[in-house]
C-alpha cells in the first residue's frame, strides 16, 4: 500500500482541479465551441477529472481500512513484547540464545538465568523440547563454569553420555574443579555403577536423621501420598517410619568403630555396664595399637558401624518379630521408639502389629534385590559432591521398567546427598542438581532445599510434563510448595488447564493493549481506539507452541535504583522495571551440537566393575546377597547369646523404673 501514489497525489490533484475549474468558470475566454464558451468546456473537464481523482483517493483510504480488518486475527501484534537482546553473564548464569517477534521483526535475544540458585523448573508435554532447550544447556554451561554436577537420568544413558562428554572435555580444558571424579549410580547395569553407602554415621549422625531417612524411603515407595487416607493412615505411616528409623539407627551404631580421615581404623575405649554387661563407649579414641596411652588420644574423622548399610537393614526386616525385638531392645537409644510395637508384641496383638509395620515389611521387601545389595554394600565415594577437597559429578540412573523400585532407592541417596551439599557455610564448590522427569523420583522436601541452599551455592533444576502429573505423585501440598518456591519458570507447549491457567494468569498476567474498532456505512467510516487490560500470553497461545518454542519468566536479582534530578525517573526506560518474561524460539548452533553428538562415541561411559562375564556377575551378586543375609543371622545369634531374655528385661527403661 503506497499512500503517496494512492491517496496523497490523487486527492491533491483532484482538489486542485476542482478549485481551478471554479476559477475558470468565471473567466470569459471570448470564444465558443458549439453553443458553450471555451472556459465552460474546460470547467466541465477539470471538475469531472478532479471529482474522479478525489473519489479514487477516498476509495483508496476506505480500502486501506477495510484491508486492515482481520489482518491480525490472532492478536499477535498486541501479544508481542520487547525482550532481552543482551547476554548478561556471570560465573553461575545460564544464557540461552533465542529469537523473538516484536514490531514486525524476528529479533535475536537471550534468556538470561542470572541466578540459578533460586531454582528452575521446566514444564512441557513430551516432545515440546524442554530437555533440548533447557536441561542440556544447563549441563553444558554449568559444567564449563566449574560446577560439580548431580544429574538424574530417567532413561539411562540419554543424559549420562552428555554429562560424561562434558566432564571429559572440560577436564581436558581444566574448567572443572581440581580432583573432580565422575560417578554413576545404576541399579540395573551394576558394572556401570559405583557403590555407595548412605546409611552410615557421617550421613546419619542422630536419631532425627534416621527418621528423616526412613520417612524419605516410605514416602517414595508410596509416591509421596503422605497421610492421604486420613488420621488412621497417618498413624500407621508414622508407626512404620518410627520402626524403620529404629532399625536404621541400630545398624548405624552397632559395632561402630572410629576411623581417621584416610580411612585407617583407630582404637576406641569401652567400659562394661555392670547391669547389662553391654560394652559402652567412653568417648576416648586412641591411635591404632595405642589403647590406654593418654598421649595417643586422637579425634576420629568419622565412625562406621559394623553392618551399617541398607542391605543389612532390609535383610533384618525379613526376620521374625521376636528376633527383631530381641535385637533392637539392646540399644537404649532406639528403645523409646519401640514402645508401642513391643507392647503390641508382648500382648500378642499381632493384627495391630501387622497394621503398624506389616505394610513396611511388604514394601521394603521389594527393594531387597541382589543389585541393590551390591550397590549399597560398598562405599566408593562421599555423597558431598560439592566438597572442595573431593568434588565429583554424580549421574543417578533409572529404568522405566523398574521405575518405582529404583526411584525409591535413588530417593534414599538423594536425600542424604542434599543434606551434605546444603552445608559448609558457603565454602563449597557450586553444585547443579538437575532432575528431569521429576515425578519418577521422590525428591523429599525439595522446597526446603531450594529455599535454604542459595548460600551454599546449590542450583536445582526440575523438569516435568504437567502440574496434574506432579500433583498425582507429590500431592497437592507438595506440588504447591515446589511451584511457588522456584524463581525461574520455563514452559514449552502444555495442555492441562491447570498448567495453562497458572502460566497465563499468574506468570504472564495482563498488560494494556490497544484495540482498534472500525465502522463503515454509506455515510461515513468511523474508527474507535480503546486501551484495555488483556492477557499478555493467553493459554491458547501456550498450548499451540511448536517444539523449540518456550516461554516463562526469570528471577530478578537486586539492582540499585537509578534516578535523575530531583529523583525523577522514566519508568518505561528504567532497567529495573524492564520485564524478565520471554516468549521465544531457542536459537542454538545446530552444527556445533551435531558435531558434539557425533563425538560422543569417542567418550564411552566408564565401567567401574568388570565382572568378565554375565555368569560371573550373577555369581558375585548372589554371593554378596547371601553373605549379607548370613551376617544378619550371625549377628542375631550373637546378640541372643550375649543378652538373655531376663537380662533384656532388666535393661529396659520400664524395668529400671
Regions found by a protein language model. Give the residues of each.
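Short secondary-structure boundary/capping segments
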Residues: 165-169, 198-201, 450, 476-479, ...
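Short intrinsically disordered, low-complexity coil segments enriched in acidic
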Residues: 1-6, 500-503, 578-589
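Short, flexible active-site loops
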Residues: 15-17, 396, 433, 486
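P-loop NTPase motor domains
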Residues: 62, 66-71, 111-458, 543-545, ...
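Basic- and hydrophobic-enriched, low-structure N-terminal and domain-boundary segments
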Residues: 1-128, 132-137, 145, 521, ...
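Conserved ATP-driven motor cores of ASCE-family P-loop NTPases powering translocation/secretion/packaging/pilus
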Residues: 450-452, 456-554, 652-655
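A short, compositionally biased
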Residues: 90-96, 179, 543-551
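Phosphate-binding and hydrolysis-coupling loops of NTP-dependent motor/remodeling domains
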Residues: 539-584
Amino acid at each position: 500500500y503506497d499512500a503517496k501514489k494512492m491517496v496523497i497525489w490523487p486527492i491533491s490533484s483532484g482538489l486542485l482541479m476542482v478549485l481551478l475549474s471554479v476559477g475558470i468558470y468565471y473567466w470569459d475566454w471570448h470564444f465558443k465551441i458549439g453553443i458553450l464558451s471555451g472556459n465552460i468546456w474546460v470547467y466541465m473537464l477539470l471538475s469531472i477529472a478532479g471529482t474522479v481523482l478525489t473519489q479514487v483517493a477516498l476509495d483508496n483510504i476506505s480500502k486501506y481500512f477495510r484491508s486492515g480488518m482481520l489482518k491480525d486475527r490472532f492478536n499477535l501484534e498486541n501479544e508481542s513484547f520487547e525482550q532481552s537482546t543482551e547476554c548478561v553473564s556471570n560465573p553461575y548464569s545460564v544464557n540461552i540464545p533465542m529469537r523473538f517477534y516484536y514490531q514486525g521483526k524476528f529479533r535475536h535475544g537471550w534468556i538470561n538465568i542470572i541466578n540459578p540458585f533460586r531454582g528452575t523448573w521446566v514444564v512441557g508435554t513430551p516432545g515440546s523440547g524442554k530437555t533440548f532447550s533447557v536441561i542440556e544447556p544447563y549441563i553444558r554451561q554449568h559444567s564449563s563454569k566449574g560446577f560439580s554436577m548431580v544429574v538424574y537420568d530417567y532413561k539411562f544413558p540419554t543424559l549420562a553420555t552428555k554429562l560424561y562428554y562434558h566432564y571429559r572435555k572440560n577436564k581436558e580444558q581444566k574448567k572443572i574443579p581440581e580432583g573432580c571424579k565422575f560417578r554413576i549410580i545404576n541399579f540395573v547395569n551394576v558394572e556401570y555403577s559405583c557403590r555407595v553407602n548412605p546409611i552410615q554415621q557421617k550421613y546419619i549422625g542422630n536419631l532425627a536423621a534416621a527418621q528423616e531417612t526412613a520417612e524419605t524411603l516410605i514416602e517414595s515407595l508410596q509416591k509421596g501420598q503422605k497421610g492421604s487416607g486420613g488420621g488412621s493412615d497417618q498413624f500407621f505411616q508414622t508407626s512404620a517410619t518410627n520402626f524403620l528409623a529404629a532399625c536404621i539407627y541400630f545398624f548405624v551404631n552397632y559395632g561402630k568403630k572410629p576411623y581417621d580421615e584416610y580411612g585407617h581404623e583407630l582404637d576406641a575405649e569401652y567400659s562394661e555396664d555392670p547391669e547389662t554387661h553391654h560394652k559402652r563407649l567412653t568417648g576416648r579414641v586412641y591411635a591404632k595399637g595405642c589403647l590406654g596411652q593418654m598421649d595417643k588420644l586422637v579425634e576420629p574423622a568419622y565412625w562406621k558401624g559394623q553392618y551399617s548399610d541398607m542391605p543389612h537393614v532390609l535383610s533384618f526386616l525379613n526376620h521374625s518379630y521376636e528376633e527383631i525385638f530381641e535385637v533392637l531392645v539392646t540399644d537404649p537409644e532406639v528403645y523409646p521408639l519401640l514402645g508401642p510395637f513391643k507392647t503390641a508384641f508382648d500382648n500378642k496383638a499381632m493384627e495391630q502389629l501387622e497394621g503398624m509395620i506389616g505394610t513396611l515389611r511388604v514394601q521394603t521387601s521389594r527393594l531387597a534385590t541382589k543389585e541393590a545389595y551390591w550397590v549399597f554394600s560398598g562405599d566408593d565415594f562421599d555423597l558431598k559432591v560439592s566438597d572442595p577437597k573431593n568434588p565429583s559429578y554424580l549421574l543417578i540412573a533409572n529404568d522405566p521398567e523398574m521405575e518405582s523400585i529404583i526411584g525409591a532407592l535413588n530417593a534414599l541417596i538423594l536425600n542424604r546427598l542434599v543434606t551434605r551439599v546444603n552445608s559448609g557455610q558457603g565454602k563449597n564448590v557450586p553444585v547443579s542438581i538437575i532432575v528431569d522427569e521429576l515425578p519418577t523420583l521422590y525428591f523429599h522436601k525439595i522446597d526446603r532445599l531450594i529455599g535454604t541452599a542459595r548460600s551454599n551455592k546449590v542450583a536445582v533444576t526440575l523438569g516435568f510434563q504437567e502440574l496434574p502429573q506432579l500433583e498425582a505423585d507429590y500431592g497437592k501440598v507438595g506440588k504447591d510448595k515446589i511451584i511457588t518456591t522456584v524463581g525461574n519458570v520455563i514452559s514449552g507447549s502444555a495442555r492441562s488447564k491447570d498448567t495453562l491457567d497458572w502460566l497465563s494468569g499468574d506468570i504472564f498476567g495482563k498488560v494494556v493493549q490497544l484495540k482498534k474498532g472500525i465502522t463503515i456505512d454509506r455515510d461515513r467510516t468511523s474508527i474507535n481506539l480503546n486501551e484495555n487490560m488483556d492477557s499478555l500470553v493467553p493459554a491458547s497461545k501456550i498450548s499451540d507452541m511448536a517444539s523449540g518454542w518456550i516461554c516463562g519468566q526469570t528471577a530478578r536479582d537486586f539492582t540499585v535504583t537509578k534516578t535523575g534530578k530531583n529523583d525523577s525517573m522514566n519508568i518505561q526506560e528504567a532497567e529495573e522495571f524492564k520485564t524478565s518474561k520471554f516468549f521465544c524460539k531457542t536459537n542454538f548452533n545446530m552444527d556445533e551440537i551435531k558435531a558434539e553428538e557425533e563425538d560422543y562415541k569417542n567418550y564411552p561411559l566408564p565401567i567401574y566393575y568388570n565382572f568378565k562375564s554375565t555368569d560371573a556377575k550373577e555369581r558375585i551378586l548372589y554371593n554378596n546377597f547371601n553373605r549379607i543375609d548370613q551376617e544378619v543371622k550371625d549377628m542375631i545369634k550373637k546378640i541372643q547369646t550375649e543378652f538373655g531374655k531376663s537380662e533384656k528385661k532388666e535393661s529396659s527403661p520400664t524395668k529400671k523404673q
